[in-house]
Amino acid sequence: MNTSLRLNHYWITCADGLETLLQEEIEQLGTKVTERKAGRLIIEGTLEHAYRICMWSRLASRVLLPIHTYELERTHDARDVAEELYEGAISFDWSLIFAPQSTFAIRLHAEREIKVNTQFATLRVKDGVVDSFMEAVGRRPSIDTKQPEITLYVLAGKTEHTYCLDLSGDSLHKRGYRRFMTDAPIKENLAAAILQKAKLQERNPEIVLDPMCGSGTFIIEALMILTDRAPGLVRRFGFNGWHGHDRELWLSLKAEAAERHEKALEQPLPKFYAYDADWEAVKATRENIIAAGFEKLLGDIQIEERTLADWPDFGAENKTAFIVTNPPYGERLGDKASNRSLYLGLSALLQKNFPNQYAAIIAAQIEQADVLAFEAPETLRLMNGKLPIYVRFGTVKLEKVTQPFLANWQAQPVEMEEAQDFANRLQKNMTALKKWATKENIYCLRLYDADLPDFNLAVDLYSDRLHVQEYAPPKKIDPEKAKKRFNLALAAIRAVTGLNRDAIFIKTRARQTGTNQYTKQSTANKRFIVQEGKAKILVNLTDYLDTGLFLDHRQMRLRIAQEARGKHFLNLYSYTSTASLHAALGGAASTTSVDLSNTYLSWSKENFVLNGLTVDHADEQHMFFASDCFEWLKEGHEQYDLIFIDPPTFSNSKKFHGTFDVQRDHVSLIKRAMNRLTSEGTLYFSNNYRGFEMDEEIEALYDVEEITSETIGPDFKRNQKIHRAWKIQHPGLN
């Protein structure tokens, strides 16, 4: 009987989680799966069936042919597994499988309950094979662990050891095209599995996008699927040195695969987009595409260095798109919080650019996948090597186009017996601000700021939530009376705004001191996203006295956004770096943010990532420094075109030697900053100290213009002393 037609059992291995998809693929190749185990399927078929799997399986890891089973006589605790493996190896005549002039290697895998030193046991298996050859033919084969002609896969079990010929040789996920690597790559067979699970071919997309392409694995695997390119067409296999190899059969299968690929290339292909913020990744993608044999298709593939914030207009309104990506979930990014912000930002971009289109996104934690706005989402858990990953599949939801809260708010009659004056004033303020907020798309603003002496509080609107700060009453005021009045105010706030209790966040603000300025108020972490201009910003209404966004500096931030294009921007006392964020989104050549607090710098990075910008990147476009601003200015020499300084009134942080007083120290601070300002640059200086006066020395040294009125929005017109601001330039520019 022709050995190529003989039925044998073969083991087809795969990554954990791929068993179902692999079974579907194998059965589509015309082979029946007879048994299924974790990470392994068993088939019964001919050599042609095995060869077809080697050639065409995009998901399998290895194709193994069991050659020899060594049954154990006893399984007591004191067993010597390594010696058992040696006995099993020497008991079989390996010269029947391959020639002594061939090189070979051993891959040993032990079942979980088997305790064995795998390195030593592998050597004993090698000894057994070599000794078997010496007994049979008097010659021994050589070991080659890097590129062996024959690989023997050995499974050490509880009742038997199984010795297999690895027909695949190297793992099947190694297609041969990955010449250049990036951090945290996805294995080729996992990428293919994700594409097959997502039904890429059936969807017949006109656009295929990977916005964080790394080394280009998804793009290349998609090309292979859509051009009917067999993954085994150009790679080496482990059966060429096997005595049972049918060369003619294999060559016929290769010819068939090549013909199918050539025929598929005649069909139209989608437009491919491969983007990454890292130029090295872009270069790796291009080189790997060429190595995969798709150089002629480069005209259909746009490979560019782009951040998420720099997406072009894809013109996808009337086209079918497919989006797939493996975001840098730790290896190329920072902490979990920044990763969550990345997924939030990616989700928002998908909703804006690709609503109702299908996407498949990898996440390292399920919580990251959960923020993706998908209809009818599905999740697949896989192992990428030793790393568990979650793949979220689904149709991108339509973007929710929201209007500012005041745009839809209508004044209603409100009767508050003991707080009628307050209710009337709040309603009057909201009515006055409504037109402006609607026209300018203002989502965050101050509605009330201690307008009435009996109601000493501030009411700030953040999207559809309120932040109510009760200023600590003077000691002469009865605490119970103050508490009652505050509760009356809260009732009036709910009545006037129509917001529920769970949308109102309450804090008590005492007079600012150096130690409590940024003191954490609770252990909650309830950040949410608000919009300001082009920027999405994370705010927190529960954990700190300040929310992450100083509303009174809105106009200054928007001004910086307009002036920043092409400029190098420096932000001192940057807090959550929202001014830097506006500068970056406004097209700044670079941004540098300096603050003493690591907490707020981490928050800053989350804001940047949320908006699709890179942080801690090799090109140093957006940099963050945890440092005292005085020391930082003294130590560096870089020049900046645009500088913003918004220092605290007073500070005596443990990290800062001595104290900072804005009135006392602003002269030396501004002079140091001006040394870092380019000759035609602009420095904006602002602070919230009500009694602040700009020193005459600064006015004598530089061109100084107070611009306070230009930086206070309509919501703060009732409190002209909320801050003061100056525009400072080197003399002779005006």
UniProtKB/Swiss-Prot annotation:
Q: Which residues form the THUMP domain?
A: 49-167
Its Gene Ontology molecular function terms? Answer: 23S rRNA (guanine(2445)-N(2))-methyltransferase activity; RNA binding; rRNA (guanine-N7-)-methyltransferase activity
The yes or no answer to whether the keyword rRNA processing is present is yes
What sort of enzyme, by top EC class, is this?
Answer: transferase
Q: Which UniProt keywords apply?
A: Cytoplasm, Methyltransferase, RNA-binding, rRNA processing, S-adenosyl-L-methionine, Transferase
Q: Where in the cell is it found?
A: Cytoplasm
**A Pfam short name:** Methyltrans_SAM
Per the UniProt entry, the Enzyme Commission number(s) are: 2.1.1.173, 2.1.1.264
The record ties this protein, via InterPro entries, to: 23SrRNA_methyltr_KL, DNA_methylase_N6_adenine_CS, RlmKL-like_Mtase, RlmKL-like_Mtase_CS, RlmL_1st, SAM-dep_methyl-trfase, SAM-dependent_MTases_sf, THUMP_dom
Has keyword Protein biosynthesis?
Answer: no
Tell me which Gene3D superfamilies the record gives: 3.30.2130.30, RNA methyltransferase domain (HRMD) like (3.30.750.80), Vaccinia Virus protein VP39 (3.40.50.150)
Catalytic reaction annotation: guanosine(2445) in 23S rRNA + S-adenosyl-L-methionine = N(2)-methylguanosine(2445) in 23S rRNA + S-adenosyl-L-homocysteine + H(+); guanosine(2069) in 23S rRNA + S-adenosyl-L-methionine = N(2)-methylguanosine(2069) in 23S rRNA + S-adenosyl-L-homocysteine + H(+)
This protein's GO CC annotations: cytoplasm
The UniProt entry's sequence similarity note says: Belongs to the methyltransferase superfamily. RlmKL family.
Q: What is the stated purpose of this protein?
A: Specifically methylates the guanine in position 2445 (m2G2445) and the guanine in position 2069 (m7G2069) of 23S rRNA.
Q: Which PANTHER family match?
A: RIBOSOMAL RNA LARGE SUBUNIT METHYLTRANSFERASE K/L, RIBOSOMAL RNA LARGE SUBUNIT METHYLTRANSFERASE K_L
Please name the HAMAP family in this protein's record: 23SrRNA_methyltr_KL
This one is known as Ribosomal RNA large subunit methyltransferase K/L
